[in-house]
């Protein structure tokens, strides 16, 4: 099992799919990485040599922000908004949708499970 960016990627999957197990790398970035390294997209992880895995690891470390660094940056961005006290920060603080979605009927994922209110039934 190859270990890239602190993640054990599955060995019997195609390289493009396996790279997507790393937080911060989707389909587009996975294709860019293997194109930059020069490995065919159809290759499977267990077919890679150690030098090819090392090239992929170096490319990701050099050019992309993934896993812990990416999670930390997102958390710091949200914290910055909350500290500023701007509208988006207030919405984050109250666990409500941030981007203008309606909250009268929907937004259950963000607001949590519905709570019963006495006298609300008609």
Swiss-Prot record:
One of the GO biological process terms: translation
Keywords recorded for this protein, A-Z: Ribonucleoprotein, Ribosomal protein, RNA-binding, rRNA-binding, tRNA-binding
Keyword rRNA-binding: yes
One Gene Ontology term of the molecular function aspect: structural constituent of ribosome
GO CC list: cytosol; small ribosomal subunit
PANTHER family in the record: 30S RIBOSOMAL PROTEIN S13/40S RIBOSOMAL PROTEIN S18, SMALL RIBOSOMAL SUBUNIT PROTEIN US13M
Organism: Bartonella bacilliformis (strain ATCC 35685 / KC583 / Herrer 020/F12,63)
Region annotated Disordered, chain positions: 97-122
InterPro entries in UniProt: Rbsml_uS13_C (IPR027437), Ribosomal_uS13 (IPR001892), Ribosomal_uS13-like_H2TH (IPR010979), Ribosomal_uS13_bac-type (IPR019980), Ribosomal_uS13_CS (IPR018269)
UniProt superkingdom: Bacteria
Name recorded for this polypeptide: Small ribosomal subunit protein uS13
Family: Belongs to the universal ribosomal protein uS13 family.
Complex and partners: Part of the 30S ribosomal subunit. Forms a loose heterodimer with protein S19. Forms two bridges to the 50S subunit in the 70S ribosome.
Coiled coil: none
NCBIfam families with a match to the protein in the record: uS13_bact (TIGR03631)
Described purpose of this protein according to its UniProt entry: Located at the top of the head of the 30S subunit, it contacts several helices of the 16S rRNA. In the 70S ribosome it contacts the 23S rRNA (bridge B1a) and protein L5 of the 50S subunit (bridge B1b), connecting the 2 subunits; these bridges are implicated in subunit movement. Contacts the tRNAs in the A and P-sites.
């Amino acid at each position: 099992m190859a270990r890239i960016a602190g993640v054990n990627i599955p060995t019997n999957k195609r390289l493009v799919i396996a790279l997507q197990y790393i937080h911060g790398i989707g389909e587009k970035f996975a294709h860019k990485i293997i194109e930059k390294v020069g490995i065919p997209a159809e290759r499977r992880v267990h077919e890679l040599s150690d030098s090819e895995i090392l090239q992929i690891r170096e490319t990701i470390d050099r050019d992309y922000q993934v896993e812990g660094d990416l999670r930390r940056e997102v958390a710091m961005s949200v914290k910055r908004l909350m500290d500023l006290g701007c509208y988006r920060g207030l919405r984050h603080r109250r666990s409500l949708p941030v981007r203008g979605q309606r909250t009268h009927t929907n937004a259950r994922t963000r607001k949590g499970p519905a709570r019963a209110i006495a006298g609300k039934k008609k």
